[in-house]
């Protein structure tokens, strides 16, 4: 009997069956005004309301018969199965740049907790005030006391899209661009290696977190079983895209091409999925500002050749997408419509960041009324979720999910 695949993503729109999320937790309560920028936030969310909104989001998916898995639960279960808390903890502490006696304090303190509480503390951050009184021997310990954390919080973890992405039956476990997020993919690596749901399968890792160049899941879109679209953005390096293409062409039996699309390197356009998402077989939502008035932008077609990679530059974005999807025409639905003010406002609040749960059916933030009405006018079924606090982290429904299994399109 053939074992069911633990991972299977061959499109952006196939009926979503299993998804990985992270419920916002105490890591959000360790954000302070002084460290907003370094933790990649513009404001401090209200956690209680944020959790209510996230629970509503999860319920919306469950009501559509989607299996919703939680990162924090799977990580604790995987850590228990690994039966080696100290090894994972040592690696986490090292990547947090803790050295000398402070690393020993942190390790000994966290080793005293069970797996659930250890994972919670690794995610929420470890304040210096939490560890019992310790003798300071070194100059750096005495001078660095004003900084409140041994381990920084990971408040962006509820955006599970970025640390990893499923392509086909394999995965990219990503090297994140910002230091504030770099440890996030360690939890995905732990789960895939040790959780019984995944550990008994040979899951190809197309790109690992030890890669030299940054790659993030918000820039990875699986258009069909033969084509991956990757944004070259503020967070994803062109060299990472090329290395990913080489890996896919040499190890994946189905991927024939990788499309690299260049988008402006700004915070508001931090990933491709903040400006472009697939909502149906031949329909996408797009932020008009990423193209010129002729609808052009730089897109590169990477294909395997006898001499390695063949790269073909193009400018006609819409036509390229139509060609690879074998569609006569592609409908681009503008985020916020044609009004530049409305478009900019709704894109900032993730109006283009839709999560497709089936062909022609999406989840969006309720606040983006113009974009949602345009989607409905184009025949798309829209489920709106409450979003006043979730949106403060600069990510939408697609950002908050890592799809693990979708049905293949017929």
From Swiss-Prot:
Q: What class of enzyme is it?
A: hydrolase
Q: Which GO terms describe its cellular component?
A: cytoplasm
In which pathway does this enzyme or protein participate? Amino-acid degradation; L-arginine degradation via ADI pathway; carbamoyl phosphate from L-arginine: step 1/2
Record-annotated active site: 399 (amidino-cysteine intermediate)
Principal cellular location given in the protein's record: cytoplasm
Output the InterPro entries linked to this UniProt entry.
Answer: Arg_deiminase
Q: Where in the cell is it found?
A: Cytoplasm
Question: Under which EC number(s) is this enzyme classified?
Answer: 3.5.3.6
What is the top-level taxon of the source organism?
A: Bacteria
One GO term (biological process):
arginine catabolic process to ornithine
Q: Which reaction(s) does the protein catalyse, per the Swiss-Prot or TrEMBL entry?
A: L-arginine + H2O = L-citrulline + NH4(+)
Keywords (alphabetical) are: Arginine metabolism, Cytoplasm, Hydrolase
Q: Tell me one GO molecular function of this protein.
A: arginine deiminase activity
Cystine links in this protein are none
Family from the record: Belongs to the arginine deiminase family.
Cite the NCBIfam families for this sequence: arcA, PRK01388.1
Protein name from the UniProt record = Arginine deiminase
